[in-house]
Amino acid sequence: SHTITGIGDGDVFDNSTALNASLVTDDQRAGLYIFGQNRHRSAYDHDGDGYSEIPKLHGQTIGFRSFLKTTTYSKLTFEYHHMEEFRRGGDLLNRPPHEANVAEQTEHSINGGGLKFDYFSPNENHRFNVFASAQHINRDSYYGPGDRDPLDAYGNTTDLNWMAGSQYVYSFGKCIFMPSDLTAGIEFNQDKLEDNMWGYNRTVDQKVNIGSAFLQNEWKNDHWGFLIGGRLDKHNLIDHVIFSPRATLRYTPTEN
């Protein structure tokens, strides 16, 4: 599909083209969904002073999501996406940003994806999953020029984030006084950020690690629900372990 949107008096346009497709095997055991988008928007100068009120934009997105049923009771899911985006505002948009009077410019490249495995027992009393995901961002930027050398306003930022974990759920037909679901899980998350503004002699280089574990039990029937649990988090920039208790009470006066 393609859409065109006029801006202002209609001499500036925002063009967007999108595509998607899905494929599923005859036995329903595997499938693939593909998506993509391309967008182009020209800069809009409302009052004709040579400075944009709305920046120009170029962007592309493409990705897919797929699944494979490895057995009757298990499934593997994989997804990936890639995004590119360029934005530029100010004046003299056809010149390098450091030659403009005012310029704000960013260019992003993002790659991300995830992998997940799900399993449940034939009687559905046991449910188990393992997952992992990651995303990398690279951004080139310019904000200036301001009162300093115009070449000082260039910067670059990179960020890599990934996480992995597992979760297990056991369903009790009756635990003490009513049916319940016991849930336990672990997670690990790491974020690596590097931000450079060379002209200002500013650099941020930071790595954050967070390890987590949680346990909860939820009793529930048609009218009542009780949940008791807790979560432990260890942050590498904090000396002590953080404990977060959790408790909820639900009452539904009418039957579903």
Which residue ranges define each predicted feature?
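Hydrophobic, lipid-facing positions within transmembrane beta-strands of outer-membrane proteins
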Residues: 15-19, 30, 60-64, 109-115, ...
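Short loop/turn motifs that connect adjacent beta-strands in outer-membrane beta-barrel proteins
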Residues: 25-30, 72-75, 120-127, 171-181, ...
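Outer-membrane beta-barrel translocator/receptor signature
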Residues: 1-48, 55-62, 73
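Transmembrane beta-strands of outer-membrane beta-barrel proteins
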Residues: 30-34, 76-78, 126-132, 164, ...
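Structural signature of Gram-negative outer-membrane beta-barrels, strongest in the C-terminal barrel
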Residues: 71, 177-183, 187, 196-256
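Short sequence motifs at beta-strands and strand-loop junctions characteristic
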Residues: 8-13, 24-26, 54-58, 103-109, ...
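Transmembrane beta-strands of outer-membrane beta-barrel pores
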Residues: 4-9, 25-27, 36-42, 82-86, ...
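Flexible loop and strand-edge segments within Gram-negative outer membrane beta-barrel domains
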Residues: 41-61, 67-69, 73-128, 134-160
